[in-house]
Amino acid sequence: MPSTYVRRFNLKDSLSDKQVGDFWKFLLAEFVPTLQKPAGVNSVKVYSGAGALRADIRLVLDMDHAGIYEGLLRERAISPLLGTFYGALDLATSTQTFIREVTPDLLKALSS
């Protein structure tokens, strides 16, 4: 069933302006395009709230099903990039959410 993964995060306070700029270049030019390639990933988008591109950031993946996420972590092209991605995040304030689309198939499965 269609699922969405949302990683909400702030960047580490210790990052310099240059490091923040480098992170954004990496995120948009390398990480997001690599996440979009595997089968089952329908879209990858990045949203920013009121945090001046340092806080209240969301990485949103729309996938065919939630199991796609586990495969992404093992994907040969993605796993070397995870250290750079997670290394810039303030993991103490980071959250992740999985939501699923309510479809007739889901209702059928839940009512069985």
Short names for language-model regions:
Residues 47-54, 88-89:
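A short beta-turn/loop motif at secondary-structure boundaries
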Residues 26-43, 60-100:
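An amphipathic, aromatic/His-enriched active-site/gating alpha helix that lines ligand/cofactor pockets
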Residues 11-26:
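Short, surface-exposed ligand-recognition loops at beta-strand->loop->(often short) alpha-helix junctions
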Residues 12-14, 51, 64-68:
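Short coil/turn motifs at secondary-structure junctions
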Residues 56-60, 110-112:
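Amphipathic, soluble alpha/beta structural segments
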Residues 54-56, 105:
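Periplasmic-binding protein-like
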Residues 99-112:
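Short, low-order "capping/linker" segments at domain edges
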Residues 2-11:
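Active-site-flanking beta-strand signature of metal-NTP-handling nucleotidyl enzymes
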